[in-house]
Amino acid sequence: MRLAEIFGANVRRVRLKRGMTLESLATEAGLAYSYMGGIERGQKNPSLDVAERIAKALECDPVNLLRMTSADK
């Protein structure tokens, strides 16, 4: 699995665990809804700045979004 796919899957898992919609996460992170969807599908490669904004919106450590498991610690 590519790193972009791992990151996207972890973002989706944490977002759903937090009860957030894709739209609310995109808004909170200051990103376009379509771009956020592309990230979750592993089709977009976000910059480190964007990854940090997503992690902040999800209230999680950005490093954990890159791991194969335990993304929501």
Regions found by a protein language model. Give the residues of each.
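Recognition helix of helix-turn-helix/homeodomain-like DNA-binding domains
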Residues: 30-45
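Short basic helix-loop element that most often maps to the first helix and adjoining turn
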Residues: 9-28
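Short, basic-rich loop-to-helix N-cap that marks the start of a DNA-contacting helix
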Residues: 43-53, 72
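Helix-turn-helix DNA-binding elements, focusing on the entry/boundary residues of the two helices
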Residues: 11, 22, 33, 48-51
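C-terminal structural segments of small proteins and small subunits
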Residues: 51, 61-66
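Short, charged recognition helix plus adjacent turn
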Residues: 1, 56, 64-73
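Conserved hydrophobic/aromatic packing and binding residues within compact polymer-binding modules
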Residues: 11, 25-26, 36-39, 65
